[in-house]
């Protein structure tokens, strides 16, 4: 695995709405850069289906996103998927350093043919994930991607962005459709929650 020198992430300003993270361990080498504005996605994790899902986050989340990840895929994809979630969560937290004026809450219901998924987001500052998803039985892998890692990815994202996310898979038969709808719905809810509505902090406590 090629090693990169770790880069200290720049402090994200309120106006920039940008986060940049470089994270290297003995198992993975991950770099994430995002801006909370529509833009291009450039994704490379060594897992084509996961790349496709991260592209959905960029497109439907209304964010420019670059992800580069190299991991011990010869062992398992878990380390790579989870560490990308950690990096994306940390970058998102940087981009949301100033929460004044944000909508805070986001909700989306996304269909993909026969599948229907609901996602709700609260930029609460308190990490929580409810993942209510009974995935279709039988097939477990999509192009080398273990669908069980979807929950692990979201948990890492939630923990490091310090946000609250609820995902409810209402129904679906095709596993690809269900997983893709999970990513799209979560991205759409994030886009709504991170939208600017004014200047006030959306909390009676005075902090998030």
Curated annotation (Swiss-Prot):
Biased composition (Low complexity): 7-19
Chain residue ranges for the region called Disordered: 1-22
Protein name: Imidazoleglycerol-phosphate dehydratase
Similarity comment: family membership: Belongs to the imidazoleglycerol-phosphate dehydratase family.
A Pfam family recorded for this sequence: IGPD
Provenance organism: Anaeromyxobacter dehalogenans (strain 2CP-C)
GO cellular component: cytoplasm
CDD domains on file: IGPD
Molecular function as annotated in GO: imidazoleglycerol-phosphate dehydratase activity
Enzymatic reactions: D-erythro-1-(imidazol-4-yl)glycerol 3-phosphate = 3-(imidazol-4-yl)-2-oxopropyl phosphate + H2O
Localization, UniProt: Cytoplasm
């Amino acid at each position: 695995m090629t090693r990169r020198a770790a880069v200290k992430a720049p402090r994200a300003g309120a106006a920039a709405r940008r986060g940049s993270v470089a994270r290297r361990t003995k198992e993975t080498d991950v770099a994430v850069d995002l801006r909370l504005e529509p833009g291009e996605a450039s994704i490379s994790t060594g897992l084509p289906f996961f790349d496709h899902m991260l592209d959905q986050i960029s497109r439907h989340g209304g964010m420019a996103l670059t992800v580069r990840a190299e991991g011990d895929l010869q062992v398992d994809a878990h380390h790579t998927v989870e560490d990308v979630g950690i990096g994306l969560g940390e970058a998102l937290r940087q981009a949301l350093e100033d929460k004044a004026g944000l909508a805070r809450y986001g909700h989306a219901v996304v269909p993909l043919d026969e599948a229907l998924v609901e996602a709700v987001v609260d930029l609460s500052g308190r990490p929580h994930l409810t993942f209510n998803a009974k995935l279709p039985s039988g097939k477990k892998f999509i192009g080398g991607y273990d669908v069980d890692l979807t929950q692990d990815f979201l948990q890492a994202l939630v923990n490091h962005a310090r946000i609250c996310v609820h995902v409810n898979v209402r129904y679906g038969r095709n596993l690809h459709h269900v997983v893709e709808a999970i990513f799209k719905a979560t991205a759409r809810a994030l886009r709504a929650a991170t939208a600017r509505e004014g200047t006030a902090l959306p909390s009676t406590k005075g902090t998030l």
